[in-house]
From Swiss-Prot:
Record bears the keyword Transferase: yes
Gene3D superfamilies: Spore Coat Polysaccharide Biosynthesis Protein SpsA, Chain A
Site (Positions MEP for the nucleophilic attack): R156, K209
Species per Swiss-Prot/TrEMBL record: Dehalococcoides mccartyi (strain ATCC BAA-2100 / JCM 16839 / KCTC 5957 / BAV1)
Residues the UniProt record annotates as site (Transition state stabilizer): R19, K25
Gene Ontology BP terms: isopentenyl diphosphate biosynthetic process, methylerythritol 4-phosphate pathway
Keywords linked to the UniProt accession: Isoprene biosynthesis, Nucleotidyltransferase, Transferase
The protein's name: 2-C-methyl-D-erythritol 4-phosphate cytidylyltransferase
Length: 227
């Protein structure tokens, strides 16, 4: 609960694992436990989170049901089928959390989320209705032409690297996802299209997204070091 309203989490785990060299990143073992189990554990154990909607690729739904049962993830109230785009998958998860006042959206392939990020995200979202986890950029970012030539260097001090969770008042994110014909790379971008403010709160460098075998190895190292 947060501000006397239910809090729901959409865990998006319907990706194709194209860069994992044949492994399914969601069920790959991390310290002897599936990546997805690490991710769900953070939300299961969070005192703020009431309900979880888990979004899976169609072919992984039965396997997800087995995992939820094995680890007793009692807050998972729905296992939904994902869509072609990430947006379609999130929309599917949102439909299962209709009675929640606040929504967190998190990548299932980010297993090293710090538990404190959940209340911190909710507190940040309370100020304007939307908030996203982010970390400062470490590298210089340049804009290039279609021919691969550098056109300009972007001001790093005004740029951030965005992570999940992304946190929203439910009415805002539901309205954002009702719009069609807009392709976005993250949830906050749809809120931005509504001309509504989005705050940032501190993410963590350890909150990596597993997309390659090298990421999985790095997650193992971070986990052993206590992140």
């Amino acid at each position: 609960m947060f501000l006397n309203e239910k809090v729901g989490a959409v865990i998006v785990a319907a990706g194709q694992s194209r860069r994992m060299e044949g492994q399914d990143k969601i069920f790959a073992l991390l310290a002897g436990k599936p990546v997805l189990a690490h991710t769900l554990s953070v939300f299961q154990e969070s005192p703020q989170v009431d309900d979880i909607a888990l979004v899976m690729a169609e072919h992984n739904i039965e396997k997800a049901k087995e995992l939820v049962k094995e680890y007793n993830f009692s807050k998972v109230i729905a296992i939904c089928s994902g869509g072609t785009l990430r947006q379609d998958s999130v929309r599917s998860g949102l439909s299962a959390l209709c009675d929640c006042g606040w929504i967190l959206i998190h990548d299932g392939a980010r297993p090293l989320l710090e538990p404190d990020s959940i209340p911190e995200g909710l507190e940040a979202a309370k100020l304007c209705g939307s908030a996203i986890a982010a970390v400062p950029l470490k590298d210089t970012i340049k804009e290039i032409s279609p021919e691969g030539l550098v056109e300009k260097t972007l001001p790093r001090e005004r740029l951030i690297s965005v992570q999940t969770p992304q946190v929203f008042r439910a009415d805002i994110i539901q309205k954002a996802y009702q719009r069609v014909g807009i392709i976005a790379t993250d949830d906050a971008q749809l809120v931005e299209k509504l001309k509504l403010p989005v705050r940032i709160f501190s993410g963590a460098c350890a909150n990596i997204k597993i997309t390659t075998p090298e990421d999985l190895l790095m997650a193992e190292i971070l986990l052993k070091k206590g992140r």
